[in-house]
Amino acid sequence: MSRIAFLLVLVATTAGAAAEQVVVDFERGAMFSANDKANRFPEWVEKGVVFRLAHEPRLSKAKGLLMFFTHLSTGRRGIVCAMALEPIPVRATFPKPARSVTVAMWGSTGVPAVLEAFDEDGKLVDHASLPSAPGRKAPGDPVPIFTMTVNAPRIAYIEFSGPREGEYLVADELRFTPN
């Protein structure tokens, strides 16, 4: 009888561990490089999730880069496309497929927000969007942080996008549940 109880406990804890949510918060990211210039980089890896632009710039020969951006009210860091004149979706590729992904974001006033989930074949499997990110209610208010979630059986990567030229959309935190 004790072997059966042991096996049940083992199965329950293994199943629970597999379903634990993983949180990526970008707090390890450096805001500035050694020479005090804005820290721009082609790729960021945290907790096995690889962040990079979905494609290279098409309107210029510039190298596509990401950067960290600080939410002034909270001091938290987020990741954003560093290409102000050519907004490019930011892609986050998971080390193993996920079944649910939630991204906390904030952005320019009125910026549209799109979150798309893709499987390992590049097929769109879920989509969430807002025509306009929530804005401040008064000039002294902090920029609101909002969340978007996508769900599908085997999400290989997500992309977040929406900004037009000169706008920004920052991922403040990414939470995913592996399969």
Model features per residue range: what roles?
Residues 1-3, 17:
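Terminal and domain-boundary regions
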Residues 12-20:
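Bacterial Sec-dependent signal peptides at the C-terminal "C-region" and cleavage site
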Residues 19-179:
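Surface-exposed, well-ordered secondary-structure segments
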